[in-house]
Amino acid sequence: MLHLLYGPAASGKTDLLMGRIRAAVAARTPGQVLLVPEQYSHEAERALCAACGDSLSLYAEVLSFTGLARRVAAETGAGDAPLLDQGGRLLCMALALDQVAPRLRLFGAAARRAQMQQTLLGAVDELKTACVTPDALEQTAARCPGYLGDKLRDLALVLAAYDAVTAQGHADPTDRLTHLAERIPESTLGHTGQFYLDGFTDYTRQELAVVRALLTAGADVTVCLTLDALTDGNEIFGTARHTARVLLDMADDCGVQTTVEACPARAADTPLRVLEQQLFSYTSAHFDDPAHTISVRTADDLTAECAWAASRALQLVQSGCRWRDIAIAARGFSDYAPALERMCAYYGVPLYFARRTDLLQKPLVALIRAAYDIVTGGWDAEDVSAYLRTGLAGLTPEETDTLENYVLLWSLRGGAWTRPEPWRQHPDGYGAPDTD
């Protein structure tokens, strides 16, 4: 059975799911599975543990689609083949291209180039995610004349050759969901489980194939979607609305009973909720907000946005607010970061970016890594520069700049750094007068 649960954001869909899982755990009903996106799994586990208590692990669990694939593979005894990492997949692609290069019409000349191999591997990933087979590509190519047909034939050959190579003892991670859909009929979890899908806006063809396999096997599947209405709703929910139609059509094709449940939007009793419901609506609404907690403004460009945000933060601090109580949220960090840093510096606003940083960029780690690179790389100038730029080499930034300029001027590398003799070249280059 397919249960479709929909409603706008903050309408209580997830709380309703948690309540149903909690009731099943209290009734000691095993096989409760909450399927969520990979990046949401830890947060969902914490929420479910808080809702269900210590007995959760006996009757329910939180999985992603890849986690479910590992679970079913272990149950059916099909998880022995080691998974290829990215390097192994590139090697398999190179081997596959070597085998079919003479037959390729468009890609043959560039088949040995690393960039082309990487590009074709990305194309294979997309084809597998969309459940496109080599036969389907061949059939489509037969109907497409000229360049497009040749390109599709080449892709069909590459995909078939890649599958043949990876079938020789190793598993491609992009095939996991395809194999999961095939193995669900052999799994007890597929027949007896109660599945709750939350946190998804839409599903790939591979994920839809898994949902179809669960429905066909007789599992109860509850899907949560964030949208306002199944028909004639707001256009911003178009993707989720299309997903709902696809799921309902799939259940109908499988001969599975469906139920649809709507979670109504909560009353617009706060300024933020009014803004949420009316921002993309073509109708107008009035809400009394004496405190003026929300204001909507427009700007000519991104820099003007950042300038207003920085000036507003400064104004709030001058009115008695603390810097740590002010946050600036932006849709895309890479787009806004340069302008935001520039404008905050202009207005004297201290700025801290709450973002993850690469561990290898930390000064101490970078120092150790650069030291190894220097030793193994023959004292290359770039490795030495990376070592000096960590700030832990005992030189000031000005001294580092002077040393780098000298090294670049005289192309010093290798043994020049390790010989006991001092450097005697003039810092100003050839032709400069000698000094003491």
Model-derived features: positions:
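Polyanion-engaging groove/track-forming segments
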Residues: M1-D436
